[in-house]
Amino acid sequence: MSLMDEFKKIIHPYDDELVMAGQGSIGLEILDQLPDVEAVIVPIGGGGLISGVAFAIKSLRPEVKVYGVQAAGAASMYKAFHDHKYETLDHVSTFADVIAVKTPGENTYELISKYVDDIVTVSEDEIATAILTLIEKEKLIAEGAGATPVAAALFDKLPIKGKKTVCVVSGGN
């Protein structure tokens, strides 16, 4: 057995504590760059990104609202959050394939239940409108998952009117 074989470890893409901790650095960066932020909206697939961001923000500024967004056709964490139980969907369908997750993370579910204020869903048409709006207004090309926070803001899914709000526009690589 080689030295590399001894140290091989499969790292879960979203349900790993170190992955979530690393993604929490985004929350720290938000607080550093916009100290008076009032709300942060984050896309959700399995929940790793929002878990880290929410934990970091709520640890330092518990009054800041942290919201999650999922595609309506792949709303596994939305369902778990609102039903107050961890569960798996039978089917997911969305062009926002990066967040098309049937089973959310167990560790992420625990953190989200504790630190996230609410989770909403957006339709495929709302995601498409957000993608086009980002292109037209910001000259930014985002894939479907990354545009879900903007869709939630554009279509008034959350109580953020008049609040200093950050939409985390992320995506697959």
Predicted ranges, named:
Residues 1-173:
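PLP-dependent amino-acid enzyme catalytic core
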